Amino acid sequence: MLSLACLLLWSWPSLAHHALSEYDSAHVTTIEGTLSEIRIKNPHSTLMVQASGSSGPADRWTVEWLAALVLKSEGVENTTLRPGDHLIITGNPSKEPGARRLWLRTVTRPADGWTWTGGF
């Protein structure tokens, strides 16, 4: 029992979400585009989105999402979203200037009105 307690206390800092520190929680960005790739996995799932640019070619965005286990508990499966889906995504942008990365807060598929909202 003592060993288990020590292990939990020792590993607790690693449970902190280091990835969230990479994103600017004070700002929200919205992108709209086509899902090109989806990876539902642990520790974070990822969406690759070709977002419509205001002028010129579409920009490829990397959108980080929650872990597969968390998403599954919220009803999101590997087949919920598919490449080719048109999506509107809001999230916190990367703190790195010019990086096209978001931490997902909401995702909507306008074709059928499916929406997911949540996150840390």
Annotated model-derived regions:
Residues 54-66:
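A short macromolecule-binding patch
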Residues 23-31:
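Short coil-to-beta-strand transition motifs
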Residues 65-73:
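Short, structured beta-strand/loop micro-motifs enriched in basic residues and often containing a Trp
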Residues 94-120:
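OB-fold/S1-family single-stranded nucleic acid-binding modules
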Residues 33-35:
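Conserved hydrophobic positions within beta-strands
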Residues 73-89:
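Short nucleic-acid-contacting surface segments enriched for D/E, G, S/T with interspersed K/R
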Residues 11-13:
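N-terminal signal peptide c-region/cleavage motif recognized by signal peptidases
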Residues 41-52:
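Short aromatic-glycine-enriched beta-strand elements
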